[in-house]
From Swiss-Prot:
This is Elongation factor P. GO terms for biological process: peptide biosynthetic process. It is found in: Cytoplasm. Keywords: Cytoplasm, Elongation factor, Protein biosynthesis. Transmembrane segments: none annotated. One of its GO terms (cellular component) is cytoplasm. InterPro entries: Elong-fact-P_C, NA-bd_OB-fold, Rib_uL2_dom2, Transl_elong_fac_P/YeiP, Transl_elong_KOW-like, Transl_elong_P/YeiP_cen, Transl_elong_P/YeiP_CS, Transl_elongation_fac_P. Its main location: cytoplasm. Belongs to the elongation factor P family. Pathway: Protein biosynthesis; polypeptide chain elongation.
Length: 192
């Protein structure tokens, strides 16, 4: 039997099981209506299908935690269908289907350390580091007058991802990106 927790102790990024399927909690809200019973609204990602859904639980409910295994691994390569990661403990290769990590794949770089999630022995997703440093390979040059506060332009990164960056960023710069939001954090190194 899986470990259960009181719904009032729910937190972001924990894994729960609902109707026999694993979910990752993305956000939650305790709701206390003027009339009626309090409840908890949970925004969660189904780790098997990738769908994000809203679940509602009574404040008195207990929910089972999903039985996940977390494996520390290093990204090696992809063959178009799967992304391959090397388990840093056993050196075994783990193949994760591309549809399981479409969002995360935009920021994957060879040699990057990640966590691979296994559910009943099957890989169902990964967790990237919170921030990654990637090189800008394509962006429009800055022009005189492009100095308005908060102005941004699109930039293509070495992994193929396109993000919005400030006007002063140019090709060859190394930028720090927040992998959770896909947004620019700062310029780490300026191109020479």
């Amino acid at each position: 039997m899986a470990t259960e927790i009181d719904i009032n102790r729910i937190q972001k990024d924990i894994f729960i099981e609902h109707k026999g399927e694993p979910y990752r909690v993305l956000d939650y809200e305790h709701v206390k209506p003027g009339k009626g019973q309090a409840f908890v609204r949970v925004k969660a990602k189904n780790m098997l299908t990738g769908n994000v859904t809203e679940l509602t639980f009574k404040a008195s409910d207990r929910i089972p935690l999903a039985d996940f295994e977390q494996v520390y691994a290093t990204y090696s390569y992809n063959d178009g269908e799967n992304y391959y990661f090397m388990n840093t403990q056993t050196y075994d290769m783990i193949a994760v289907p591309k549809e399981k990590i479409e969002e995360e794949a935009k920021f994957l770089k060879e040699g990057m350390e990640v966590i691979v999630f296994l559910y009943k022995g099957q890989p169902i997703g990964i967790e990237l580091p919170k921030h990654v440093e990637l090189q800008v390979v394509e962006t429009e040059p800055a022009f005189k007058g492009d100095t308005q506060a908060g102005g941004t332009k699109p930039a293509k990164l070495e992994t193929g991802a396109v993000i919005q960056v400030p006007f002063f960023v140019k090709e060859g710069d190394i930028v720090k990106v927040d992998t959770r939001t896909g947004s620019y954090v700062e310029r780490v190194k300026e191109a020479k």
